[in-house]
Amino acid sequence: CDDPYESNFFKYFVIHFQEFGLKKLIATCYAASQVAYTQFPVPDVGEENRAEKKSSKIVITQVGQVTPPDTAPSDVAALLKNPNNQLSLLEGDGDFRSQECLELLEECDLVATNPPFSLMKEYIPLLIQRGKQFIILGNLNHITFREVKPFVLEGSMWLGYHSGHFWFRVPSNYEAKGTDYKQDADGQKWRRMGNSCWFTNVDIPKRHVPLTLEAVYSPQRYPKYDDYDAIECGKYREIPADYRGVIGVPITYLPYHCPEQFEILALVTPKIDGKSKYKRLLIRRRPENGGAEHGQPAEVP
């Protein structure tokens, strides 16, 4: 789902093609490329198709020496000089739900992309139902979607490395902002997006590192919810080390979740004194990590 002429995802995997031992790299373009039909024409598409700027796919099976970090669009033209690499038009518009794109998906072992955020509720279920490994850029609030939430709760999807505020390059015509915006010495404009994260089902060592907990439970510090048998913990750093009942934590806890330490029970919108809190993950300490009775603080030696 990335235009090979403009996508940094494509450039990254071209640079590391040999290092990663890749057999094939496939990229499809939904929106017509602003580069492919101008600076570096798509070969053999015909004038009619060129005028329509139809979507295309590129299949790379051989990559020579690439000098990082720069891979300009001209590298695509160089890649296509190798007869083993091919760029061709798609029959449809490149929608990931189309039959031809689903057939391309079946060829893949791993999907890495920045999907349309508005379609995340369709994209993530598709990848999981098709049994594909994936590393995709998203927003932490996507876990609150009804279609996405079950995969977090059942442990079939989690967060990868890095989350929070990400800086993204934006076009030159992007309007300057008072906050979360900058322009570097080269004139490149940047926009910072909060709550950005990587969704994945690829296991990583970070996922199995338990949180170091130092806070101590007290009823005054951790009030109970009106509608759930759980206590409120407003920050993941303040999870009480001596509590073995159900704890409500913000969704910002998720990057630090260790499945061997806690189980995720639900995603809810609880109330305290009649006032709704934002979405909370209800978590509980794994039995092997504690022995106190449900809802009671453990004894601290």
Give the residues covered by each predicted segment.
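Class I S-adenosyl-L-methionine-dependent methyltransferase catalytic core
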Residues: C1-A112, P116-P301
